[in-house]
Amino acid sequence: MSAEKAKAYWQLMRMDRPIGSLLLLWPTVWALVIAAQGIPSWDVLIVFVLGVFLMRSAGCVINDFADRKVDGHVKRTKQRPLPSGKVTAKEAIGLFLVLAVSSFLLVLTMNPLTIQLSFAGLVLAFIYPFMKRYTHIPQLFLGLAFSWAIPMAWAAQTGELPVMVWFVFVINALWTIAYDTQYAMVDRDDDLKIGIKSTAILFGRHDKLIIGVLQLVTLAMLVGLGQFYQLGQSYYWTVLIAASLFVYQQHLIRHRERDLCFRAFLNNNYVGMVIAIGLLVAFW
């Protein structure tokens, strides 16, 4: 394999832009810490950290495969490996299969419940990229896909799925819809021209308000999470920091400028990180 081809594969997997992997990683860490009531098992932690990066890369590859005929018409994506011809569709499918199989081999080291849950996770990862052609709520499907690591991680750590798993699942799904709507605001004008659907288009002039409502509900549920587990003051400080980050994001998207909407999206990495830190400190 040439250096140029390897670089194209690297870019196709978004390894040069790890924001998506980080946004998937932090909620997985939340689940592991809560399930373990502290530091999770090292073998489980390693499997899920590796799995996050492998499955996020697989998701990016299948997403670009699904969008290969439209990405060339979008300013932000026209230089991606598939529309630019650096990687063929056949090569992309092959890479997706390698990444998906590698992820599954990791899951096979976990308990039977985790293995069973992984099949639904793979289905969600595969169908999400195609939803933007058929529904205005692909962000909901991304929320489900990005949250599925939560029950998987919980099951791997404890072997069971208590009700609070699904409470954390909903927290993350709502937050994901909010930040992916910010991301969709970047491409809204291009998406309207080529017929791609998104919540940014569906929400229209109410986009900022609905994002704000989703963020408020996320914060309220994070507070509820702390109350359920009787977490200390340190946790609530991190929720307050997350709230301030949401306020900053609202400031960034106020004029719906592409670059600032993208900055707001990127800022969500810090939201996930501070909540992970808060949970770790509280449960330690």
From Swiss-Prot:
Q: Name one Pfam family in it.
A: UbiA
Protein name stated in the entry: 4-hydroxybenzoate octaprenyltransferase
Under catalytic activity, the entry for this protein gives: all-trans-octaprenyl diphosphate + 4-hydroxybenzoate = 4-hydroxy-3-(all-trans-octaprenyl)benzoate + diphosphate
Give its E.C. classification number. 2.5.1.39
- Give this protein's Gene Ontology molecular function annotations: 4-hydroxybenzoate polyprenyltransferase activity
Per the entry, which co-factors are needed?
Mg(2+)
Question: What is the membrane topology noted in the UniProt record heading this document?
Answer: Multi-pass membrane protein
The function of this protein is: Catalyzes the prenylation of para-hydroxybenzoate (PHB) with an all-trans polyprenyl group. Mediates the second step in the final reaction sequence of ubiquinone-8 (UQ-8) biosynthesis, which is the condensation of the polyisoprenoid side chain with PHB, generating the first membrane-bound Q intermediate 3-octaprenyl-4-hydroxybenzoate.
GO biological process terms, alphabetically, are: ubiquinone biosynthetic process
Keywords in UniProt for this one?
Answer: Cell inner membrane, Cell membrane, Magnesium, Membrane, Transferase, Transmembrane, Transmembrane helix, Ubiquinone biosynthesis
The record lists the membrane-crossing segments as: 33-53, 93-113, 136-156, 159-179, 209-229, 235-252, 264-284
Q: Where is the signal peptide?
A: none
A cellular component term (GO) from this record? plasma membrane
User: Main localization of the protein?
Assistant: membrane
Q: In which pathway does it act?
A: Cofactor biosynthesis; ubiquinone biosynthesis
**Which EC main class describes this enzyme?**
transferase
Instruction: Tell me the InterPro entries matching this sequence.
Output: HB_polyprenyltransferase-like (IPR006370), Prenyltransferase (IPR039653), UbiA_prenyltransferase (IPR000537), UbiA_sf (IPR044878)
The gene name reads ubiA
Spell out the subcellular localization from the entry. Cell inner membrane
What family is it from?
Belongs to the UbiA prenyltransferase family.
